[in-house]
Regions:
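Soluble N-terminal interaction domains of secretory/endomembrane membrane proteins
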Residues: 1-161, 167-168
């Protein structure tokens, strides 16, 4: 369960839709395969304008996308990765990217212009979400189960101590 690959791309608004797309920053974590090429040559051209979408790829992977104002925020995940978590990841990188760069900087950027300045941020966010990828509801249930386990262990320790005291009483 992980985010394998992510990118931020900009469509050249002067040309026709999907004809001239610039990948401004991309990052992959332990990805084996030609995901970057497939994404740039095929997937980016299919992303609908001003929409959120999912694309299954070979039943093992899912592309998650957000397209707003000529920018596409995309990540590729294992099929088992929670969809809500992937979209939260995309919203967070969109927010960080928009805070770091002015609209003018973003709209004038050339291909891979922001790899050096934003690639590390993108990679760190991918690592964070890969380590904390549980659906928020599952994470809450897991925390509650751990708290319950701690209480039960404390109760068992108390019972064991009382058992020893009872044993001493019976012997005397």
């Amino acid at each position: 369960m992980s985010i394998i690959y992510a990118l931020i791309a900009r469509e050249d608004t002067q040309s026709g839709y999907g004809e001239n797309i610039h990948v401004l920053v991309e990052q992959s974590l332990d990805a084996v395969g030609n995901f970057p090429q497939i994404t740039r040559q095929e997937i980016l051209k299919k992303v609908p304008k001003n929409d959120r979408s999912l694309y299954k790829y070979k039943e093992k992977y899912v592309y998650h996308t957000i397209n707003e104002d000529s920018f596409t925020y995309l990540c590729l995940t294992d099929a088992s990765f929670p969809k809500r978590t992937a979209m939260t990841f995309l919203e967070e990188i969109k927010k960080s990217f928009n805070e770091k760069y002015s609209f003018d900087e973003r709209i004038k950027a050339i291909t891979f212009k922001m790899n050096d300045s934003f690639g590390g941020i993108l990679g760190n966010k991918m690592k964070y979400y890969n380590q904390n990828s549980l659906d928020p509801r599952l994470a809450r249930i897991k925390n509650e189960a751990q708290a319950t386990l701690g209480i039960m262990e404390g109760n068992l320790d108390s019972v064991n101590e009382r058992g020893e005291k009872l044993e001493l009483l019976v012997k005397s």
